[in-house]
Amino acid sequence: MSDTQISSFLRKYLADEDRKIRAQFKESDPKNKLILWMHEKTRITEDDLKRPYTKDEVRELCLRTKVKVDMTAWNCLWEAKKRFDAKGRFENKSEKFINRMYMKAVRRKMVQPYPEEYVAQRREVIAAETKKFNISRLDRWQKQKSQNRSAPESSSALVGHASQQDSQDNEAVETHEDQANTNRYSVSQMEPMARPVVSASDLSGIGDDEDEQQQQQSEFQTEHTDCPETQMRCDQINSGSLPMGLTNSESAPDYYMFGTQLSTSVRPTSTQEADDQIACPETETNESWVRCDQINSESMSIGPSIDSEGNISLQNSGSEPIDVDSMA
C-alpha cells in the first residue's frame, strides 16, 4: 500500500502541536520527564506516515480492528439538534416537524455548514492519528507473537528439567526399595520360633462322643436358624418338653424340618404304638401315622391300616378287615 502524502497543513499542524506541549511542560522540571517521554513515544512523525502497510498487516487490521464512523463530526445539523433538545422543542413531535425545524435553523443561520476545506483538513489530521494508532497496534501484536514463539522453547526447557528431576527421584525410590527388599530377605533368613510342646495329657477329652454330639447339635441349629419350625423343635429338645419316643425316632428331624411323615425304613415298635396314636381334633378318633408304607390318616383317608391284631382294614369304608395270613 502506498504511503500517506504529507501536506503543508499537516506538517504545520504537527509542528504546532509539538511546540504547544513542550511549552506547557518544560524539560527543566523533573516532574515533566515522564510526560515528555510519553509525548515522544506517541508523537506523529513523517516516518510513521511514510511507512507502507503490507497485505498481511492490512488483513490483520481489518480482522482485529472495529470500524466506527462518527456521523456527528463537523455536522451543523447535529449542533442544531443539541440546541433544540436543550430547550425541549422536539419532545412528542413528529419527524416532519423536526425536519422543518432543521431547515429553519440553517435558513436563519442559527448554525452554518462547515467549509469543505476545513472538513478536508480535519480528515487529514484524523487519518494521520489513525495511522499512528495502527502502527502501535501492529508493533504490539508483533511483540506478542514473538513472546508466544519463545514460550514453547522455555516450556520445553522446563519440561526437560522436570524430567531430569523425576529421574533422580525414581533412582532414589529404587534405591530405597532395594534396601527394603534386602532387609526383608535378612528377616526371612532368621530361625523360626520354636513351637510349644503339647503332651498327651493335654489332649485328653478331645474328640469324645459327648463333644461330637454337642458340635453336631450346634451345626444343625446354625444351618436351620431361618426355619421357624426347626427353631421351635430345637427349643423343645433343649427344654426337654418333647416326648422321648419322638426324640429317639429317626423321623423327628424329617417331619419338623421338611413337613413329611415317618420314613419307610422306620417301623414303630409295640412300645411306641401308644405314643403314635394321636387323637384327631376334627373326628375325635385315633389317627395312625404310617401303615404299610403309606400315609394313613382319618382326615386324609388314604390307604389301608393295620390294627393291633394284624388285620388290614380301610379307613372311612364299610369293608371287612383283611386277614394277612390268608393273603400270604
UniProtKB/Swiss-Prot annotation:
Q: Where in the cell is it found?
A: Nucleus; Chromosome, Telomere
Subunit info here reads: Interacts (via C-terminus) with Su(var)205 dimer (via hinge and chromoshadow domain) and with moi to form the terminin, telomere-capping, complex. Interacts with HP6, which is also part of the terminin complex.
Molecular function (GO) terms for this protein are: telomeric DNA binding
Question: Which of UniProt's keywords are assigned here?
Answer: Chromosome, DNA-binding, Nucleus, Repeat, Telomere
Tell me where the sequence motif Su(var)205-binding Pro-containing repeat 1 sits in this chain. Answer: 228-232
| S-S pairs | none
Give the main localization category: nucleus
User: To which species is this protein native?
Assistant: Drosophila erecta
User: How is this protein named in the record?
Assistant: Telomere-binding protein cav
- Region: Required for binding to Su(var)205; residue ranges are 107-320
Record's compositionally biased regions (Polar residues):
144-167, 180-189, 295-319
Disordered: annotated span: 139-228, 295-328
Functional description taken from the UniProt entry: Binds to chromosome ends in a sequence-dependent manner and is required for telomere capping.
The misc remark on file is:
Multiple telomeric associations (TAs) in the same metaphase spread often result in multicentric linear chromosomes that resemble little 'trains' of chromosomes, hence the name 'caravaggio', an Italian train.
One GO biological process term is:
telomere capping
Q: Which domain of life is it from?
A: Eukaryota
